[in-house]
Amino acid sequence: MSARAVTAVLIPAHIEQPLETLLLSGFRDIQRLADMVIPVDIEQQQVTMWLDAHDRYKSLPMNLRASSLRSYWDPASRQLPALHGDVLLVGDTGSTIAIGDVPTALIHTLVHGGPYEVETQADAGQPWRVLPDVHESYTDAATWAVIQLERHPPVADVRIRETMRPAA
């Protein structure tokens, strides 16, 4: 168990529920998600996603936001099944049961930031093209970015950038 409370982000499966920050005192708090939880490490972001180990067996709803974030942050995971049920995001400490804080900048991006735009690039070295849609949340932008990569073969790379709110 950790010696101090750490900041985590809950990503609810139900899209209408907002992401929220939580304070966890240790691994037992993660186990409140389910009787048996499994980690999904996202090394590029130094975080771990925890979810119900029996997510599909229990017919839990797909977690589009967590699945999109994993696919955007870890391109190798794009061929893996979607994540289901609520997902708890914690800082990765390199240990199986020790947990750390989600990086502060990432908490801001996920919970407090926005709006965001998605940019695409056809080939390395080519100019980036800003797509016309503005997304209120980072998770919405990540979903759109992954769709661009999967459904538009001319797109070789995508990135998400925080942008200014459109003038009213």
Task: Enumerate the language-model features and the residues they cover.
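Short, structured protein-protein interaction patches enriched in aromatics and acidic/basic residues
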Residues: 45-75
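Ordered, amphipathic secondary-structure segments that act as subunit-interaction surfaces
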Residues: 76-102
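Surface-exposed beta-loop interaction hotspot
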Residues: 95-115
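Short aromatic-glycine-(Arg/Gly/Cys) micro-motifs in beta-strand/loop hairpins
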Residues: 108-129
